[in-house]
């Protein structure tokens, strides 16, 4: 069998983490089998679909490395195909026009609720006479097209993740609406999701439909449509939902859910793709957690996708992202960090590329996300300091002023300042004044950075010295004592 899979987002919002995870699984499956990965944009919701969302989805998939082989195809450009399918179903007596008004449908639901019955359409317009139909149209009623569902029918399929799945026609809520608001006999208005998806999958020869478990009920309905249209039914695989920490489906209420959000927070695309591949799938070597999409595709199988929901683990994502950051060449990492430093107001300090790369090399081991760079480097820009409470107290320690003054004089005499020379100055001051080395180290950190915690002191000192900022800062610190 030639494997053809698709990712079919609706452009009613930015690329969501759930859609992206589904795209990852489809991409991995296609590449494992040497198949085709198709992008289809399901934009039939004209009110909510926006071109900017389409672009966001395409950009997000490409950013993640999920390049499609065919498409994008747009449902709004395929209305004739849907209308032809609807006409086929009408001609075969498998679909019909329903003229129920919203008020009638609401009254039906209220009566069912009062009778402790599940809400469903009672198929009341399935067998209208021509006279009844003419009367409804004379009243100006706009019909919908409904597909007939036999309540007694069983729908069975072998789900590639969940095994045998069985649904009854009676579980599907009555005859299904497949198009709304037709304009006369020759036009069927707007086709709805289940009909359009089936026609698309038939025309695009989709062999496997891999999507979230929230589509299981749709699958039962769609299988009936495949059969009614005389088409082969693709194989289905329903992936587990992504859950929040409370075990509920991850939603917008949880805050960060779009790929844009993750990108702005400083996650790398390869780290997100890596992590999403593990959201529900377990590699053969369960201890392996870092791999490229290509590496994951070599062993990806739906048999190793879990049925249970996958909890989104921020700590795990941070850890994976850090692994990629720490392995990245400094020049490439510097390029990625510059926008964050510019946004933080440090743009004036970024012109010296060798110095900037040295700064990045200093803080890189401390980075978990790209956005962390502003916090990790904030004490290393400019010729002035702001002393916090602990640094102020350290500078008030007896003898510190004299120590800093002597070190300052020695710095000014240095012609090639290195970390080793910085250590030598610390050791010299320690011996000369008979104090513990820690006192001198803490005092220098306070005087150079204004705080007692931060990056490696010697490396930081050298970077500051290369700009002449260490002298200015120490003068400021000494003046405050």
Swiss-Prot record:
CDD domains from the UniProt entry: GluRS_core
Organism: Picosynechococcus sp. (strain ATCC 27264 / PCC 7002 / PR-6) (Agmenellum quadruplicatum)
Main EC class the enzyme belongs to: ligase
Domain of life: Bacteria
Motif ('KMSKS' region): 249-253
Entry-linked InterPro entries: aa-tRNA-synth_I_cd-bd, aa-tRNA-synth_I_codon-bd_sub2, aa-tRNA-synth_I_CS, aa_tRNA-synth_I_cd-bd_sf, Glu-tRNA-ligase_bac/mito, Glu-tRNA-synth_I_codon-bd_sub1, Glu/Gln-tRNA-synth, Glu/Gln-tRNA-synth_Ib_cat-dom
Binding site for ATP: 252
Keyword Magnesium on entry: no
Keyword Nucleotide-binding: yes
Motif ('HIGH' region): 9-19
Cellular component aspect of the GO annotation: cytosol
Cystine bridges: none
Enzyme Commission no: 6.1.1.17
HAMAP family: Glu_tRNA_synth_type1
Reactions listed under catalytic activity: tRNA(Glu) + L-glutamate + ATP = L-glutamyl-tRNA(Glu) + AMP + diphosphate
The protein's name in its UniProt record: Glutamate--tRNA ligase
First-listed, main subcellular location of the protein, grouped into a coarse class: cytoplasm
Cellular localization per UniProt: Cytoplasm
Single GO MF descriptor: tRNA binding
UniProt lineage: Bacteria, Bacillati, Cyanobacteriota, Cyanophyceae, Oscillatoriophycideae
NCBIfam families found in the cross-reference section: gltX_bact (TIGR00464), PRK05710.1-4 (NF004315)
Functional summary from the UniProt entry: Catalyzes the attachment of glutamate to tRNA(Glu) in a two-step reaction: glutamate is first activated by ATP to form Glu-AMP and then transferred to the acceptor end of tRNA(Glu).
